[in-house]
């Protein structure tokens, strides 16, 4: 595991975010672009990575330290990946828009796994590589297999079945990336507020 942390952090609180999904669907690129603003051109399969960065959230510009936990989607890491789940505040269930099978795996593998290890943790369904939905080469490859890119409506339907919000982005074009994390952080804050209210009622 490696760690990346911005110097001079002025965060008021900290949250842990874990990303899961098929290997090669774009999880690592999403985290790197968000934390550094640079898109990595070379694919390197993830074992486990941990980035720590700050995010400014809300109208009051609250600074939150966000621990970003990357996970490997390959089957050989199925026994190790659960080590990333404890104390998670929010989880991103990721798939690639140019790979319909990766969305199916969200339903068949990733959502059940997350529900098993983190049944009360908020989740966000994230469609990655949105730029490839209209990419000629990508759509042609899918066409030869009798497939088409995942539509927004298809992904939204899956998200609704999991009672989760859905958002799309393109790390390569750096579009929608910040919105993914703003949405995720918002869920952690709502979760904390809800827990506080319940605690007050109990007391």
Swiss-Prot record:
Alphabetical keyword list: Cell cycle, Cell division, GTP-binding, Lipoprotein, Membrane, Methylation, Nucleotide-binding, Prenylation
Lipid attachment in record (S-geranylgeranyl cysteine): 200
Entry's Gene Ontology cellular component terms: cell cortex; cell division site; cytoplasmic side of plasma membrane; cytosol; division septum; plasma membrane
GO molecular function annotations of the record: GTP binding; GTPase activity; protein kinase binding
Pfam families: Ras (PF00071)
Locus of motif Effector region: 43-51
GO biological process entries: actin filament organization; division septum assembly; fungal-type cell wall organization or biogenesis; positive regulation of septum digestion after cytokinesis; primary cell septum disassembly; regulation of actin cytoskeleton organization; signal transduction; small GTPase-mediated signal transduction
Compartmental location: Membrane
The keyword Oxidoreductase belongs to this UniProt entry's keyword annotation: no
Cysteines engaged in disulfide bonds, as pairs: none
PTM sites of type Cysteine methyl ester: 200
CDD domains found in the cross-reference section: Rho4_like
Annotated propeptide span(s): 201-203
Transmembrane residue ranges: none
Function comment: Required for cell separation. Involved in the regulation of the septum degradation during cytokinesis and in the organization of F-actin patches and cytoplasmic microtubules.
Family under the similarity heading: Belongs to the small GTPase superfamily. Rho family.
Protein name: GTP-binding protein rho4
Taxonomic classification: Eukaryota, Fungi, Dikarya, Ascomycota, Taphrinomycotina
């Amino acid at each position: 595991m490696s760690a990346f942390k911005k110097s001079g952090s002025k965060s008021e609180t900290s949250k842990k975010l874990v990303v899961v999904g098929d290997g090669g669907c774009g999880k690592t690129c999403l985290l790197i672009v968000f934390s550094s603003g640079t898109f990595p051109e070379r694919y390197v399969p993830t074992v486990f990575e941990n980035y720590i960065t700050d995010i400014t959230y809300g109208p009051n510009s609250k600074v939150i330290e966000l621990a970003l936990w990357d996970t490997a989607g390959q089957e050989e890491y199925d026994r190790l990946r659960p080590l990333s789940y404890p104390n998670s505040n929010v989880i991103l269930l990721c798939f690639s828009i140019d790979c319909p099978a990766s969305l199916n795996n969200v339903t068949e593998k990733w959502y059940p796994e997350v529900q098993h290890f983190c049944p009360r943790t908020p989740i966000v369904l994230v469609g990655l590589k949105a730029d490839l939905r209209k990419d000629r080469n990508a759509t042609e490859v899918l066409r030869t297999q009798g497939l088409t890119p995942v539509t927004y409506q298809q992904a939204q339907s899956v998200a609704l079945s999991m009672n989760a919000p859905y958002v799309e982005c393109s790390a390569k074009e750096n579009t929608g990336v910040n919105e993914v994390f703003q949405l995720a952080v918002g869920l952690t804050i709502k979760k904390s507020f809800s827990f506080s209210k319940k605690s007050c009622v109990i007391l």
